[in-house]
Amino acid sequence: MTKEQIIEAVKSMTVLELNDLVKAIEEEFGVTAAAPVAVAGGAGEAAAEKTEFDVELTSAGAQKIKVIKVVREITGLGLKEAKELVDNTPKVIKEAAAKEEAEEIKAKLEEVGAAVEVK
């Protein structure tokens, strides 16, 4: 029996006969004819590319004075505020930065020995 003959036979069947055929095939081959259900509810949002990043200083490292200077340059803070920020790590240095800007800030801080995370 060819595929075409099987298709012609299926075309001539009633809905009840098709239902019986599907059940018989399921039993014979141990499969189900149910359509797979997608369970990924929030995955669509996670798949969208992130456009804003937070740059977090996790550790000042050994060259704290150089890190303070870079933090002042990036944030525009005064000496006292920048020192407090560096002393109380982990702290967010820049919020909602573009990807390129966040990477530049990270590179500047790592260059002077700081540990940085981009989130």
Swiss-Prot record:
GO cellular-component term (any): cytosolic large ribosomal subunit
Molecular function via GO: mRNA binding; structural constituent of ribosome
Keyword Ribonucleoprotein: yes
The keyword Ribosomal protein is assigned to this record: yes
Gene Ontology BP annotations: translation
Oligomeric and partner information: Homodimer. Part of the ribosomal stalk of the 50S ribosomal subunit. Forms a multimeric L10(L12)X complex, where L10 forms an elongated spine to which 2 to 4 L12 dimers bind in a sequential fashion. Binds GTP-bound translation factors.
Name of the protein this chain belongs to: Large ribosomal subunit protein bL12
